């Protein structure tokens, strides 16, 4: 039985992750963390009351194996660091980490010999989309990314879009696309510039998480797209990560590292 605590349990992703833990036979929800929650316990599905922790140090009393984090960027880094320092393997879906923070956390995990995962996207289909895009970029160097999310998402572009761009750049040299003399009549019209690759962010109500990688070449085009219509699409990856991190001795970045 893997003992799990969930941080950010009241958010969309956090609540879905909490439900997944409760419904999974080999997982045990030993607590939830929210520094702003006044209640001392909370019940899910009218079952046993689960302790709510407002201070990080309080979490240690239930000795979790895994710390699931779907919070906000300014909280996720100290949360993840705390988890690693106290023997908990973090599974983090919060985006917005800097490269320096990821490197620091990776080094700490190696020191402590504790596994962990930070992943921009836990949907298996999204991970495959990124891998397919990386493969296609070897033959189609002209590419743009369009990512679409619900209008409450805080960061843009999405972590998935950034990760996709990074994977593409591993196999494709920096390349400025479009007409060298092009002019934006409205600033930002061509999207964010990632080493010549353009990323476009759409935020609309009714969306969940979607991404399209658009390739173009002489006389042909290739579109690779993934759609998450429900947040449950991410839970297969979260469950997989929870089982994997307790067997590993290093923090990884990207769910593809565990597939």
UniProtKB/Swiss-Prot annotation:
Organism listed in the record: Enterococcus faecalis (strain ATCC 700802 / V583)
PANTHER family for this protein: 4-HYDROXY-TETRAHYDRODIPICOLINATE REDUCTASE 1, CHLOROPLASTIC-RELATED, DIHYDRODIPICOLINATE REDUCTASE
Keyword terms of this UniProt record: Amino-acid biosynthesis, Cytoplasm, Diaminopimelate biosynthesis, Lysine biosynthesis, NAD, NADP, Oxidoreductase
Classification via Gene3D superfamilies: Dihydrodipicolinate Reductase, domain 2, NAD(P)-binding Rossmann-like Domain
SUPFAM superfamilies membership: Glyceraldehyde-3-phosphate dehydrogenase-like, C-terminal domain, NAD(P)-binding Rossmann-fold domains
Gene: dapB
PROSITE patterns: DAPB
EC number: 1.17.1.8
One protein family per Pfam: DapB_N
Classification lineage: Bacteria, Bacillati, Bacillota, Bacilli, Lactobacillales
Pathway: Amino-acid biosynthesis; L-lysine biosynthesis via DAP pathway; (S)-tetrahydrodipicolinate from L-aspartate: step 4/4
Binding site for NAD(+): 8-13, 93-95, 119-122
Stated family: Belongs to the DapB family.
Function: Catalyzes the conversion of 4-hydroxy-tetrahydrodipicolinate (HTPA) to tetrahydrodipicolinate.
Annotated localization: Cytoplasm
Binding site for (S)-2,3,4,5-tetrahydrodipicolinate: 150, 159-160
Primary location class: cytoplasm
Protein name: 4-hydroxy-tetrahydrodipicolinate reductase
Single GO MF annotation: oxidoreductase activity, acting on CH or CH2 groups, NAD or NADP as acceptor
Catalytic residues (UniProt): 149 (proton donor/acceptor), 153 (proton donor)
